[in-house]
Amino acid sequence: MSGTATEEQIQAICRSADAYLYDRKAGGYRLNTDFKEEKFDLGRMFGFAYGEKENGAVFSHMAVMYANALYKTGHAKEGYKVLQTLLDTAMDFERSKMYPGIPEYFDNQGRGLYAYLTGAASWYMLTMITEVFGVKGQLGDMVIAPALMPEQYDQEGKASLKIEFAGRKFSIHIFNREKKEWNKVQIKEAFCDGTLLSAEGGRQARLKRSEIEKLTLEKVHEINIILN
């Protein structure tokens, strides 16, 4: 997330996490493997049974931060796997035994616990907005660089997001009619209320701050991004 790891190290981290920590039944990526010993002198982590809380549970907050870091470093497919596994587990009531939402952690059976005691939900939303849909602020401008997977588009090849930015309301629509992979497409055209936006290198669209300030506060402004 800090940009410290090299590309080679990131790939090694992904391979290791998949090999040692990923457990679909439990709900995703565990915090650690089973050390098979109790080490109370190392703090509360090793005071729990394996699969509970900080000792090897699928800890939602850390999993979402891992996903965020993967998206930031250009590994959207791997990041999507982290987010989607959490969502699938939470929405499977027979397994999670909880109302729809993101719990603090999932235990060995995939049961969600402590639905209120986590920052994962806010990090999940942050990642969906700023990394998956790719909507960010940059020196006052709005930039949009989507990294959506083909399965995240509807039948018409459309994915939508409603947000507020700089006090204005926006409805953002990403069109990928052929549902190509995120790194196989470029931004062909981008519009805000019918006005053409710049598509920088085909990777991101930009709505400048000076243009945002001209937009009315009451209206929901429509941004359309066409990928090809």
Where are these regions (language model features)?
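His/Glu-based metal-binding/catalytic segments typifying zinc-dependent metallopeptidases
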Residues: 1-8, 13
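Non-catalytic C-terminal accessory modules of carbohydrate-active enzymes
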Residues: 15, 19-25, 34-41, 47-56, ...
